[in-house]
Amino acid sequence: MISHQTIDNRGLAYATAIVEHIEADPARHAVEQAQERCQRWMKQAPSPDLLAWSTLLSRPWLEIKKSLLDLSEQGNRLRQNNPFCGVLSPQERWTIHRAFRSHET
């Protein structure tokens, strides 16, 4: 079974890769897409975490980045429900996932 710590570390690895993608795009299109996705999700099933993301996504990129990479429990919780799906390719996601498979027992 995979530990919560490993799940949190894997989530941080995904977030780090997402940040790298977003920073490579000066227009930050992925942030705009995440805002739209978050709005759709809020209409379907509002939650405190989506409300937090909705608020956060209206802030400057550096604040969003800081939250994505935040090592606190708040950061872990936000990463578990982040609206940046689709930023990483399937290959990138699997590479990260496989890197953490050795931590499963």
Residue ranges and their predicted role:
Residues 3-56:
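The feature represents the first ordered module of a protein
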Residues 28, 47, 62-63, 74-75, ...:
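A general structural signal for well-ordered secondary-structure junctions
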Residues 31, 35, 49-50, 61, ...:
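Alpha-helix initiation and N-capping motif
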Residues 42-43, 61, 98:
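Non-transmembrane "mature" sequence context
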Residues 53, 59-67:
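Mid-chain, well-packed structural core segment of small domains
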Residues 66-105:
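Short, compact, well-ordered microdomains
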